[in-house]
């Protein structure tokens, strides 16, 4: 992939990058970046660092794709070597942001880490497993079009859907489709810690050929008596009915449960566990935010400090609108949880895509789950 260098007459706005979520956990690296920026002014530190190593950057996290391995017909695992400043002490179940330059534009999405946090002295590499979605431009490109050697931008690991250490004695994993990805990191970590003592895993996929990590899961079940795997092929057997989960897992109420998958599965799990008074033992991870029906006609979104404006309809998030116009916005989960994307609303009104709530000027809004409700101005 070709590398675009910043010219000497670039403005400060031209060189802005998304705020890296989790940067405050490792202030030392970011202090070094600031020092490098001062020493190399008026040139950018990256103008020098890139000559030594394309993974070195004073303003962002970077990584190199070492390889791509197909998991199923529509999914693949990316092996990524992170560069300077990446922290390998993430927790199993967390996700990272990945930015890829496609057709002259940086496209960002968040994906669950499927690797286990690196032990001291181990190879410094992480993996994410991506399922190509019909509406997902970047996911399709990552699965089918990205080549080894490609340099990507990274956002630090984050997320609260994590496995503690030590792990609880009784565990239940409920996964469906690509919802297995964060749990795969947990399983690999349990193996590394030698903590697979009593784990039940119920996984659903349309067919056996659609099961991500199918061979590895089968090997885990064969090698570890404490890991019991049940795979349901929904095309032939229908969807798992969690109201009858007691038939498969009689002690499910006593188990700490991690569930990840389509919205329907998670909503049913939430209801079943709540009805049983076991909500405190259920941990959910949602890959997409539930949105209300669009209201209004959208409007023109102006990004004040970037000096750019773009027309956006009522169903397009402020983040998507901004990135489409080339504005680099801070981001994290992209689904309204982590609060990394909040900016000040200077003028106009925006609407929360989840609740329909209208936000007034002078408030801070989440750009990933808010849309224009008429013309508006954001302080970024």
From Swiss-Prot:
Its main location: membrane. [2Fe-2S] cluster binds at residues 333, 338, 341, 368. Interacts with DesA3 to form a functional acyl-CoA desaturase complex. GO terms for biological process: electron transport chain; fatty acid metabolic process. Pathway: Lipid metabolism; fatty acid metabolism. InterPro entries: 2Fe-2S_ferredoxin-like_sf (IPR036010), 2Fe-2S_ferredoxin-type (IPR001041), Beta-grasp_dom_sf (IPR012675), Cbr1-like_FAD-bd_dom (IPR008333), FAD-bd_FR_type (IPR017927), Flavoprot_Pyr_Nucl_cyt_Rdtase (IPR001709), FNR_nucleotide-bd (IPR039261), MRET (IPR050415). GO terms for cellular component: plasma membrane. It is found in: Cell membrane. One of its GO terms (molecular function) is 2 iron, 2 sulfur cluster binding. PANTHER family: NADH OXIDOREDUCTASE HCR. It is an enzyme of class 1 (oxidoreductase). Residues 299-380 form the 2Fe-2S ferredoxin-type domain. Residues 58-164 form the FAD-binding FR-type domain. Binds 1 [2Fe-2S] cluster. Its cofactor is [2Fe-2S] cluster; FAD. It comes from Mycobacterium tuberculosis (strain ATCC 25618 / H37Rv). Is likely involved in the aerobic desaturation system responsible for the synthesis of oleic acid from stearoyl-CoA; oleic acid is a precursor of mycobacterial membrane phospholipids and triglycerides. Is the electron transfer partner for the stearoyl-CoA 9-desaturase DesA3. Catalyzes electron transfer reaction between NADPH and the diiron center of DesA3. Cannot use NADH. Pfam families: FAD_binding_6, Fer2, NAD_binding_1. Keywords: 2Fe-2S, Cell membrane, Electron transport, FAD, Flavoprotein, Iron, Iron-sulfur, Membrane, Metal-binding, NAD, Oxidoreductase, Transport. This is NADPH oxidoreductase. It is a peripheral membrane protein. PROSITE patterns: 2FE2S_FER_2, FAD_FR. The keyword Transmembrane helix does not apply. Its EC number is 1.-.-.-.
């Amino acid at each position: 992939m070709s590398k675009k260098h910043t010219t000497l007459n670039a403005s400060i706005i031209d060189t802005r990058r998304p705020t890296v979520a989790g940067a405050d956990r490792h202030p030392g690296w970011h202090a070094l970046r600031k020092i490098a920026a001062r020493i190399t002014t008026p040139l950018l530190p990256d103008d020098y660092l890139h000559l030594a190593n394309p993974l070195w950057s004073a303003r962002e996290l970077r990584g190199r794709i070492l390889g791509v391995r197909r998991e199923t017909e529509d999914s693949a695992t990316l092996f990524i070597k992170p560069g300077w400043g990446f922290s390998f002490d993430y927790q199993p179940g967390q996700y990272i942001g990945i930015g890829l330059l496609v057709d002259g534009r940086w496209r960002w999405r968040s994906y669950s880490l499927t690797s286990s946090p690196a032990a001291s002295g181990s190879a410094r590499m992480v993996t994410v497993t991506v399922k190509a979605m019909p509406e997902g431009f970047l996911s399709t490109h990552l699965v089918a079009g990205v080549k080894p050697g490609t340099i990507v931008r990274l956002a630090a690991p984050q997320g609260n859907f994590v496995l503690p250490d030590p792990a609880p004695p009784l565990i239940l994993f409920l996964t469906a489709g690509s919802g297995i990805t964060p749990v795969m990191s947990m399983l690999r970590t349990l193996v590394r810690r030698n903590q697979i003592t009593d784990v039940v895993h119920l996984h659903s996929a349309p067919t056996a050929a659609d099961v991500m990590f199918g061979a590895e899961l089968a090997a885990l079940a064969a090698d570890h008596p404490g890991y019991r795997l049940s795979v349901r092929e929904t095309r032939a057997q229908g969807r798992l009915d969690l109201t009858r989960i007691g038939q498969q897992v009689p002690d499910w109420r006593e188990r700490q449960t991690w569930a990840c998958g389509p919205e329907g599965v998670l909503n049913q799990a939430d209801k079943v566990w709540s009805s049983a008074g076991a909500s405190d033992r259920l941990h959910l991870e949602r890959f997409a935010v539930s949105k209300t029906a669009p209201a209004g006609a959208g409007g023109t979104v102006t990004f004040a400090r970037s000096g750019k404006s773009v027309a956006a309809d009522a169903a397009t998030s402020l983040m998507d609108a901004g990135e489409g116009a080339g504005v680099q916005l801070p981001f994290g989960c992209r689904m309204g949880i982590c609060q990394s994307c909040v900016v000040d609303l200077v003028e106009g009104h925006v609407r929360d895509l989840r609740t329909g709530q209208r936000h007034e000027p002078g408030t801070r809004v989440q750009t990933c789950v808010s849309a224009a409700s008429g013309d508006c101005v954001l302080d970024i």
